[in-house]
Amino acid sequence: MTELAQLQASAEQAAALLKAMSHPKRLLILCMLSGSPGTSAGELTRITGLSASATSQHLARMRDEGLIDSQRDAQRILYSIKNEAVNAIIATLKNVYCP
């Protein structure tokens, strides 16, 4: 693969990741998960002010895109960031927008 082809593939991958993150509530959820891995959907619903169904839809989209992972703990499902690139992007955004 040529250098240009590799760069194009990387750009497409980065654009897909940013697109999956590019909703204010999804960014808020990811910020919460970066500081508190293993947070329940109920807690994320409370923090974001979204309805349970809206929170669930955002979590499902991010899980389908490979951004987050879920783990069952008794009756709760706990969410964590799965993709290290997401952690790096969230850390950069926090440095720029939350000094």
Swiss-Prot record:
Residues 41-64 bind DNA. The keyword Transcription applies. SUPFAM superfamilies: Winged helix' DNA-binding domain. GO terms for biological process: regulation of DNA-templated transcription. GO terms for molecular function: DNA binding; DNA-binding transcription factor activity. Induction: Part of the ygaVP operon, which is repressed by YgaV. The operon can be induced by tributylin (TBT), a toxic chemical used as a biocide and in textiles and wood preservation. Transcriptional regulator that regulates large-scale gene expression in response to sulfide. May act as a global regulator responsible for redox homeostasis. It functions as both a repressor and an activator. In the absence of sulfide compounds, it negatively regulates many anaerobic respiratory genes, including formate, fumarate, lactate, nitrate and nitrite reductase genes. This is HTH-type transcriptional regulator YgaV. It comes from Escherichia coli (strain K12).
